Each structure stands twice: as C-alpha cells, then as structure tokens.
C-alpha cells in the first residue's frame, strides 16, 4: 500500500495540478476529495495544454482510475461539459468513477451564490460564483441532493420540488430575484445524470480495495490550506476542507491508510480574492512576478495578488496538514530579481510572533519580518537536479526548507512537466 496526498500550502494556485499530473505517472488511482469546479488545473500533456476544473488530473492516463469523491460538490452541467471537452480532444474518460454520495450543484445554488455576493458589496468574500458554498450549506442543513438522488427521477423530483419552495422564497423575498420553476431544472439535470450514470459507483469501495491490493493511490486536493474552512483565513475561505484530514471524510478512506502528504508551494506567494495578505507586493517587483509567472486565475481570469514567500503561512500548513514533503514550484519566476525576501515571522503590536493568527483583525495588523537573500540571473529552466542550480538559488531553496521544517522532495523550474525534478520519492514505503 502506498498513499500520497497532495495539498496546497498557501491560498491555492500553487501548481497542484501540475504536481498531481507529474505524480500520477507512478500512481494507479487518482482521487479528488473536496471542492468542485471552483478549482482550476492547467495541465500540459503530450505538448497540449488542457484546463480542467472538476475531473482529476490523472484522466489522461487510460490505465489509471480517476475518482470524484463523496466530499466533492458536482455541477452536473459543468461535468458533462468537461467530459465533452475531453472527448473532443480524443481523451478517453472510461477510467472515471464518481461517488454516488457526492452532492450536486443545481441552478439555484449558482443564483444564490451570485446574489449573496452582490448583497455583501464591500464585504464580499471573493467567491468564484460556482455555487460551491450554497451546495455545501444544503449538505450541512441535510437538504442537499446527492448523485444517487439525481439518478432516480422520482426521488430527484420530490427533493427538487421541496427545495425550490424554500429557495424561491429566499430569492424572491430576500434578494428580490426571480425564482425557478421545477420544469426549468428537472428534465435537463435528470438527463445530465443519465449521461454520467455509467461512471457512478461507491468510490469508497474502489479506493479501499485499491489500497488493500497494494496499489498506489494519489489524493488530489483543491484550493489550499489557507482556504480551508477550519484552518484558513476565515471567512475568506472555501466551504470545504482542503487540508489532508479532508481526505478521510471526502473519500471514505480511514486515516490509518494515509502515508505521505506533499505540500505544494510557489517560491513566492499568490492569492485570489479578498482578505489580509501580509507579504503582498504593490510595486514593480510584484508586477514583474505577476507577468513572468502568468499569475491570472484559471477559473476566473482575475489577476492574482502577489507577495514574497511567507514561511509563517507554510509552517501553519505543515502543522495542520501533517506535511511530510515539500514541492516548490515556479522558482524560475524569481530569476533576475536582485534581492529576494522571505518572511520569517510577523510583528504584531510591537512583538514578534511565528504563529499564524486566527483573528483577521490581528492578521491585518501583522507586519512581515523579512530575511533578505541574494537573487540569481542565470537561466535555470533547464536544470535537472539541485547541484545544477546557481548557488544563490540552491541556498534559497535550502532556506525555505529550513524555515518551514519540511524536507524538499520536488522542485520545479518551469510550467512543463519535464521541468519538474525529484529530490526524493514521495512513494517511499
């Protein structure tokens, strides 16, 4: 048995899709366990760039099983669209399995997400408006519709009718927005269910059987630890648990079966949406990193906020996710910057702290305490191992590993999977 979890150590967009794709080569099963199509993965495979939002990155390997776990919320329309996108590019999806326990995103979730964000105005969270939060709200309120319900027309119609009474009242009375008729949703979404029916199984059985048979299973997290609803910068977070602990809940695999946790990080920090960001850059260096690193959201196209590497954030991620291996991406983006900075602690009310505060008011007052390191000018995009890196680049990586307390296992010097280098295997016993 060999199981590896891939999590983002920052606010998402760390390059998890690329690393998951890279690690998928040696995995036999690849599973997602939380989130929905609010996550964006850009993957290069055989010279072609693909953008996925819902389906696991391992779909390009025909012999590997790809799982959409029970902890996810699935937009059936988006799923059918993504399947068609892959089929048009001659990518087989026969290796996909979808949990019958996953919850379903319906049009009223999308509408509620949109109108609630508009209502908040200046206090908005920065949601992707994909209906993720409202779907998880229904799940917690025990009125959600699951994939198993979607496949049974009678059950689907009954639950949909009951939910529409409440949702329409909410939309019309509170938001002064138009509600939905049952016929607007029922036939269309039941048909989506029929189109994906062949993929639907109890994925907990699939995953546990694979592990019991000694197969390599890779769990793919979406977003990042700092967007975790419990451990992140609440309320500027997602509605699920991207931390490694989310695997056991969102996949139906027990905690004793998780072996290694890979924390994926950029060599700097980015963030999409609102909320405090202690190391954020508002200068030419920030603009340079954004443009060189093409820091624009895969899902939204929004420019990402950019800042220096924050070891306080990544240490927090290591602790709450039990990270055993560090994968450091986008090192090449920093080439040409004369002096690099790493945040080693925060200054709060005149005192130094190395812990990440729970209070956003406190976080907003935190000033980063920086350690400066000399940069490098050499082209590193063709580097294949640590010894080939310029001395300053190697020292930068070593310092990040020291400050975060996570051994470096993978480093990446460009967007292509061939620019990903292994220092030590994450599939070790």
Curated annotation (Swiss-Prot):
Q: Which residues form the active site?
A: 13 (proton acceptor), 41 (proton donor)
SMART domains, alphabetically? Adenylsucc_synt
Keyword Transport among record annotations: no
Which residues does the annotation say bind IMP? Answer: 13-16, 38-41, 128, 142, 223, 238, 302
Residue positions annotated to bind GTP are: 12-18, 40-42, 304, 330-332, 412-414
User: Known catalysed reaction(s)?
Assistant: IMP + L-aspartate + GTP = N(6)-(1,2-dicarboxyethyl)-AMP + GDP + phosphate + 2 H(+)
Task: Write one Pfam family the protein is assigned to.
Answer: Adenylsucc_synt
Q: What is its EC number?
A: 6.3.4.4
Q: Which InterPro entries match?
A: Adenylosuccin_syn_GTP-bd, Adenylosuccin_syn_Lys_AS, Adenylosuccinate_synth_dom1, Adenylosuccinate_synth_dom2, Adenylosuccinate_synth_dom3, Adenylosuccinate_synthetase, P-loop_NTPase
Instruction: Locate the residues binding Mg(2+).
Output: 13, 40
State its location(s): Cytoplasm
Q: What class of enzyme is it?
A: ligase
Q: Which GO terms describe its biological process?
A: 'de novo' AMP biosynthetic process; IMP metabolic process
Instruction: State any GO CC term.
Output: cytoplasm
Annotated cofactor note: Binds 1 Mg(2+) ion per subunit.
Q: What GO molecular function annotations does the UniProt record carry, in alphabetical order?
A: adenylosuccinate synthase activity; GTP binding; magnesium ion binding
* Coiled-coil stretches: none
Which residues participate in substrate binding? 298-304
UniProt function note: Plays an important role in the de novo pathway of purine nucleotide biosynthesis. Catalyzes the first committed step in the biosynthesis of AMP from IMP.
Q: Which HAMAP family match?
A: Adenylosucc_synth
What name does UniProt use for this protein?
Answer: Adenylosuccinate synthetase
Gene name, please?
A: purA
